Amino acid sequence: MEELCLKLKQDLENYFSMPFEIQPVFKDGEVHYVCSPYNEDQMYFSVEVYIHNKIRLVIEIYPQKHGGYILNEMAHAPEEKQSTFFSYKQMLVDKGLKSCYSVNKSDLLENKWPITWRTFDFKMTKIPIPDNVNECESILVELVRYSFELIFSLLTITDISEEEFLQKAVQTEGTIQEIKSIRYERNPINRKLCLYKKGYKI
């Protein structure tokens, strides 16, 4: 249990360059791993992952206790981000995950995006899962990372290193279109979708 917590924490922090908190919770005799970007005020969202009945991998994504800001930002995501979100969702479906996404207790549809989000509940399942423990844990860690990418695709996140890069690019490149192109290519979510659409295995 502690080893898997460490694997999840290291993978997420190395990939996203931000601190994460992993909490193991026992529910009905099963260990649930609750993962979230580190914040003391519980203002973001959590990804909860567990193995159910030893045959099904389950991922649930939901806002934290004081996640109103995140709900508002997701609700007002521009159409470009909404499109990226649904493309990523389809990619996960093509990887064998069954999904159920609801907002305000109604199905979230591409042509019906609520402008007010009071709550959201995204659930994905994968069955069957490998019998080999190491292989199963590798899939679990990978799918948790994908789950965070799914939500991050709707949010505006810019790190300092990227800002510094863009400032230098403005001085050398000089056009808005080139800067937008650089930003897009450096975004790991966009890059992953591009590779996926071109038929590369990711």
PLM regions: where:
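Short, charged surface segments at domain edges that flank catalytic/cofactor-binding sites
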Residues: 165-202
